[in-house]
Amino acid sequence: FPPFSVGEAGRFGFTSRREIGHGALAERSVLPVLPPEDDFPYAIRLVSEVMSSNGSTSMASVCGGSLALMDAGVPLSQHVAGISTGLVTEMDDDGNIAKYVILTDIIGAEDHFGDMDFKLCGTRDGVTGFQLDLKIRGLPFNIAKEAVKQVTEARMKILDVMDACQPAHRKELREHAPRIEMVQIDPEKIGALIGPGGKNIRRITEVTGANIDIDDDNSGKVRVYAKDRDA
């Protein structure tokens, strides 16, 4: 989230509190749809670079991140989308809310002058992450309920567009993506795979460029790590 994305002049080279907070919310929202490690034993680094911002870049990062993961071949259970709602209120003489308007997909000015920034992420089945920032003393239940209903309807529309663009994850990883494969062999054949003094396993590594890791529990599970599909 560089300063120029919001028209500011600032320093580069360190992570800001805004980037940490937005990143944590986006990560928490995407985690529930990631596959278990046994099915997809890869380390995943998801980067969202903001070039221009006028509100809710964390929600854009969730939507863009979900599309990017699907396009990369990560088998997400389903898409995740996020959107924010705002609130503008008018108080009576006693300090109670007399009038209010709930705003969907707020921009920077509506966030600055408004009374609420309610970010909510989820799939078609439920919520995966949310964050509520308020400038008023409290949020009445009826307004909170209306805001959730409004943001849920908006999320479904976003998911419709995302599903039309990328309905499912790619069946295979990109050609040049690192590969991890698990092969089950007869435990009695482990010695033959290793060879005298590790001769066989070293030869395989030299020829293919792949690394081979054999589980220590004598289960016969062999993991092959390669830099790309050809290896």
Protein language model regions, located:
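Polar interaction faces of repeat-based domains
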Residues: E206-D217
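Long, charged amphipathic helices and adjacent flexible linkers at domain junctions
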Residues: K157-Q184, R229-A231
